[in-house]
Amino acid sequence: MRNPSISITPEGLPAIGLCTLATLTFALIGCWVMAVIFLLLTWFCCHFFRDPERVTPTGAGLAVSPADGRVIRVEPVTDPITGEKRTCVCIFMNVFNVHVNRMPVAGTIRNIVYHPGKFFNAAWDKAATDNERCDYLIEDAEGGKWTMVQIAGLIARRIVCRVDEGDTLTRGERYGMIRFGSRVDLYLPDGYCPTVSVGEHVFAGQTIVARKSPEGA
């Protein structure tokens, strides 16, 4: 169950402020068509930049979704940082999803690599290698290595990273966002098995997407 408490992410305040100012300005001069248009834009920006609180599951040996959206792929893929073949859980965010990204596990950010690139549809396979993206290598308390990739999409034109290498964060903690539709890939370390399948809708910091297998415990 999602927590009803909702705030606005700081990245959205400039856009919301400008749209609100434009709405008031056009209303004061009697240009009601433009006032309504900017009122709708203000609502859209508030909706897009919403940042609801989430109840993150507790317990050992589990990972939560790093993003809101729909699972579009769960399959072995070459990890862009380690070069190893790992199970990847791919989550696609449309423009109506919450776009704040959260940590899948508690751990330390060991490496951050930004790649400038193109802006193909984030659901396409080639988006993982050709699009603008940001790779994160996370080390958990047991030494497990997790790779997380923010991928900009067709409309998304800015990846926001709020962390630095060496930062230690908790499971479900906010680490960044991507604006206006995008994708996040999570590469699982050995010993973890996915708990979601293609087509499922997940929520950042809340939906369990992987668990440690009995053999890996």
Swiss-Prot record:
Task: Tell me its EC number(s), please.
Answer: 4.1.1.65
GO CC terms, sorted: plasma membrane
What post-translational modification does the entry describe? Is synthesized initially as an inactive proenzyme. Formation of the active enzyme involves a self-maturation process in which the active site pyruvoyl group is generated from an internal serine residue via an autocatalytic post-translational modification. Two non-identical subunits are generated from the proenzyme in this reaction, and the pyruvate is formed at the N-terminus of the alpha chain, which is derived from the carboxyl end of the proenzyme.
For the modification Pyruvic acid (Ser), which residues carry it? S182
List, separated by semicolons, the cofactors it needs.
Answer: pyruvate
Question: Which Pfam families does the UniProt record give?
Answer: PS_Dcarbxylase
Q: Where's it mainly located? A: membrane
How does the protein's chain sit in the membrane according to the entry?
Answer: Peripheral membrane protein
**Which pathway does the protein contribute to?**
Phospholipid metabolism; phosphatidylethanolamine biosynthesis; phosphatidylethanolamine from CDP-diacylglycerol: step 2/2
Q: Which domain of life is it from?
A: Bacteria
Kindly identify the residues recorded as the active site.
S182
Site positions (Cleavage (non-hydrolytic)): G181, S182
What reaction does this catalyse? a 1,2-diacyl-sn-glycero-3-phospho-L-serine + H(+) = a 1,2-diacyl-sn-glycero-3-phosphoethanolamine + CO2
Q: Where in the cell is it found?
A: Cell membrane
The record's comment on cofactor binding reads: Binds 1 pyruvoyl group covalently per subunit.
Function (record text) = Catalyzes the formation of phosphatidylethanolamine (PtdEtn) from phosphatidylserine (PtdSer).
How this chain assembles, per its entry, is: Heterodimer of a large membrane-associated beta subunit and a small pyruvoyl-containing alpha subunit.
Q: What is this protein called?
A: Phosphatidylserine decarboxylase proenzyme
Instruction: State the encoding gene.
Output: psd
